[in-house]
Amino acid sequence: MSPKKAKKRAEGANYNVFSMFEQTQIQEFKEAFTIMDQNRDGFIDKNDLRDTFAALGRVNVKNEEIDEMLKEAPGPINFTVFLQMFGEKLKGADPEETILNAFKVFDPEGKGVLKADYIKEMLTTQAERFSKEEIDQMFAAFPPDVTGNLDYKNLVHIITHGEEKD
């Protein structure tokens, strides 16, 4: 394929990527990308991923794990590639699994519960911040147990199915 055709095909792929999402979703992805692009060079690289994991409390991430993540990208991860990768992952994704995976980032041991105080801190200080009222509503609907833990697996099930697990 000629370089001109390859460029046209890439441009067409970019158009398709942006047409997969609503404008508000693209803006949310842009926020996430900006948070991850720690050195602000327009690309997510190994150091950016390491810093992002550290910010999430995972300081001992193995190089192999980061390398595996980077191998999923067809090249350097700029915003368009980032969006394309998410588009491919989310195509046909189960909403329950998607939300569970978001919680699992904060639960590296896979316990299925998180400290309510930690969730409150994350939801009020990161990305699209929850208001005090929203936090109060969430904990009124899904109160933590007596030890202060929130069963996020049950929470996700209720969010996606409207009822508690049996």
Curated annotation (Swiss-Prot):
Chain positions found as Phosphoserine: S19
Compartments, record wording: Cytoplasm, Myofibril, Sarcomere, A band
Location of N,N,N-trimethylserine modifications: S2
Primary location group: cytoplasm
GO cellular component: A band; cytoplasm; myofibril; myosin complex
Taxonomic superkingdom: Eukaryota
Binding site for Ca(2+): D37, N39, D41, D48
Signal peptide start and end residues: none
Gene Ontology molecular functions: calcium ion binding
Modified residues (Deamidated asparagine): N14
GO terms, biological process: cardiac muscle contraction; heart contraction; heart development; muscle cell fate specification; positive regulation of the force of heart contraction; regulation of the force of heart contraction
Quaternary context: Myosin is a hexamer of 2 heavy chains and 4 light chains. Interacts with MYOC.
Note: This chain binds calcium.
Name of the molecule in the record: Myosin regulatory light chain 2, ventricular/cardiac muscle isoform
Source lineage: Eukaryota, Metazoa, Chordata, Craniata, Vertebrata
Gene it is expressed from: MYL2
